[in-house]
């Protein structure tokens, strides 16, 4: 899954290689910081053509891999 691999890469940038589940919070626990979230948003815009200006966006939805997948699924339903 591209999403999981990208998140693993973001965590690795901070020497965080601890395992995590798809539903585990990553932002609320501090594993991903605001800069990582910006990189994630840019990745989703370029890789999946998600237009965050066109969807009801709550940054908390990017807190887990499953939340990110839900955002992509919602976008695909609207696009």
Would you name each region that the model predicts?
Residues 21-33, 56-64:
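Glycine-rich loop motifs involved in handling phospho/adenylate chemistry
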Residues 1-19, 70-79:
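Thiotemplate assembly-line natural product biosynthesis machinery
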Residues 54-57, 62-78:
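C-terminal structural segments of small proteins and small subunits
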Residues 38:
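Conserved catalytic core of two-component sensor histidine kinases
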């Amino acid at each position: 899954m591209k999403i999981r691999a990208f998140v693993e890469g973001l965590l690795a940038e901070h020497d965080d290689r601890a395992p995590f589940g798809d539903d585990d919070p990553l932002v609320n626990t501090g594993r991903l910081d605001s800069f990582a979230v910006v990189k994630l948003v840019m990745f989703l815009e370029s890789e999946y053509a998600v237009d965050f200006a066109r969807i009801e966006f709550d940054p908390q939805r990017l807190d887990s891999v499953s939340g990110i997948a839900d955002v992509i699924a919602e976008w695909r339903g609207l696009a």
